[in-house]
Amino acid sequence: MSQHPHVTTVDRMTKAVLGGDAETLGTILSNDFRFHYRGPYPKPGDYTGPDGLLEVIGEIVKATKGDIDLEQQFCVATDGWVAEWEHAVLGREGRHLESDNAFVYRFDRDRIAEMWMFIGAPPGSEAFFV
């Protein structure tokens, strides 16, 4: 069975975000992209445009010095929607933080128009970033 093209796009987006690749994100995200981010990681809130997504993920990459291990549990697509679940392990100064995170993506044709990111880290996880 082949992979849905929107799943491929989500995988490309993840790689681009973690790599800070704004040029690739410009081809993946719609011009009016919206990002909704909830959880105990830095900078929760609502953002417009790829810069907001890069700002949020950039803070996490900076705090962990890139010590981020993501394991996609599933990623499924139908019509203009994608749902994804991942297990993340972040490392910082000899400590580790694990979370199970949920993502929902709304597509406009072949580009991501809106993204919801919900961090499933345990209570008190904010201290990991201080």
Question: Residue ranges of each PLM-predicted region?
Answer:
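A solvent-exposed, acidic/Ser-Thr-rich amphipathic alpha-helical stretch
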Residues: 24-78
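Short, mixed-charge, low-aromatic patches
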Residues: 8-18, 40-44, 58-62, 85
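A beta-strand edge to alpha-helix "cap/lid" segment located at domain peripheries
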Residues: 2-5, 54-130
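Short, low-complexity N-terminal intrinsically disordered segments enriched in polar/charged residues
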Residues: 1-31, 130
